[in-house]
Amino acid sequence: MINKDIYQALQQLIPNEKIKVDEPLKRYTYTKTGGNADFYITPTKNEEVQAVVKYAYQNEIPVTYLGNGSNIIIREGGIRGIVISLLSLDHIEVSDDAIIAGSGAAIIDVSRVALDYALTGLEFACGIPGSIGGAVYMNAGAYGGEVKDCIDYALCVNEQGSLIKLTTKELELDYRNSIIQKEHLVVLEAAFTLAPGKMTEIQAKMDDLTERRESKQPLEYPSCGSVFQRPPGHFAGKLIQDSNLQGHRIGGVEVSTKHAGFMVNVDNGTATDYENLIHYVQKTVKEKFGIELNREVRIIGEHPKES
């Protein structure tokens, strides 16, 4: 789909320096895997996102959105059409007890701003390696807290390029799910309503959560974060551990020996390695316990062409 007409049209909508052609996506994912994007766009304004989305819709060009690539696997075949990186939409503003943050802002950074202003409610996010857009998309959470507990609204763009402002209720936030996924929307910014707190207490809670995370999670290797959703009444990591799968490797990717809920890239692993290992773990746990493990990590892009 790389053609001159699309490139020239994009140049009319967004500055040329924000457009990359045939761009390797492994540079932008935590797994360090992924093929190329036909067109990789890095808008810095909401209006630029709207313009590109509207053009793509009118011309039936597929659009894919990327945040900081922390909970996603991109196949080696790459992504056709237009990939829009939202990382440059990274503003963070504080107004009384509320924080408004752009889609590309790291939720860790937003939690630290909350700390700076002695606002409580985002401590749970101090170790989540995702962007605001991704966090709202999947209702990210950790250690008993989640986005739906403190979000006020999200400003989104629909498939036609129109702006939509959704309240907490309208976002339909559920366990690792939201209306954003169901309606193929993209988050441009989100507002969080917090509460005044004591800085020392907020800091202490964040320090505790950070220590717990660092002691339990395999942060020394590239990974896609938590691979599976929590099955009702169970923990995915415990099921995988009890299936004796820790350390099991396919290609360069293995089930972490530190935390069975993670898969790490230990030796130049590929997206195909990740996908094959995920399927193997799902099959093994299903056979042993009769429990389906549903993915939390997103897998997108085309399979590599067979040589």
From Swiss-Prot:
Cell wall formation. Gene3D superfamilies: 3.30.465.10, UDP-N-acetylenolpyruvoylglucosamine reductase, C-terminal domain, Uridine Diphospho-n-acetylenolpyruvylglucosamine Reductase, domain 2. It comes from Staphylococcus aureus (strain COL). One of its GO terms (molecular function) is UDP-N-acetylmuramate dehydrogenase activity. This is UDP-N-acetylenolpyruvoylglucosamine reductase. Its EC number is 1.3.1.98. Residues 33-197 form the FAD-binding PCMH-type domain. The gene is murB. One of its GO terms (cellular component) is cytosol. Its cofactor is FAD. Belongs to the MurB family.
